[in-house]
């Protein structure tokens, strides 16, 4: 409400776990909870959403929390 009149959009990107150097047991336990693909996200699963938020395609989007976790929080 305060920044919108100045043309400033405020959004949040909330990724779930992203595959990195987690132990096998952590990955296995996490993957059981994921609805899509039964796997942790890869960086290339997250980057398109970030590009969208930076682009003109999201020029009328503000105040949103874009959760990208493969359905883990369902």
What function would you assign to each model-found segment?
Residues 35-46, 57:
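A conserved structural motif in NAD(P)-dependent oxidoreductases
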Residues 1, 5, 12-35, 45:
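A glycine/serine/threonine-rich, flexible loop-to-helix segment
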Residues 4, 9, 61-63:
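Short, small/polar-rich loop/turn modules that mediate ligand/substrate recognition or access, typified
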Residues 9-19, 54, 67-69:
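Conserved SDR Rossmann-fold cofactor-binding beta-strand/turn motif
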């Amino acid at each position: 409400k305060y920044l919108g009149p100045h043309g400033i959009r405020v959004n949040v990107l909330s990724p779930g776990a992203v595959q990195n150097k987690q132990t096998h047991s952590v990955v296995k336990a996490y993957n059981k909870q994921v609805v899509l693909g039964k796997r942790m996200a890869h960086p290339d699963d997250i980057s398109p959403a970030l590009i969208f938020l930076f682009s003109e395609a999201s020029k009328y989007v503000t105040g949103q929390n874009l959760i990208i976790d493969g359905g883990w929080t369902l």
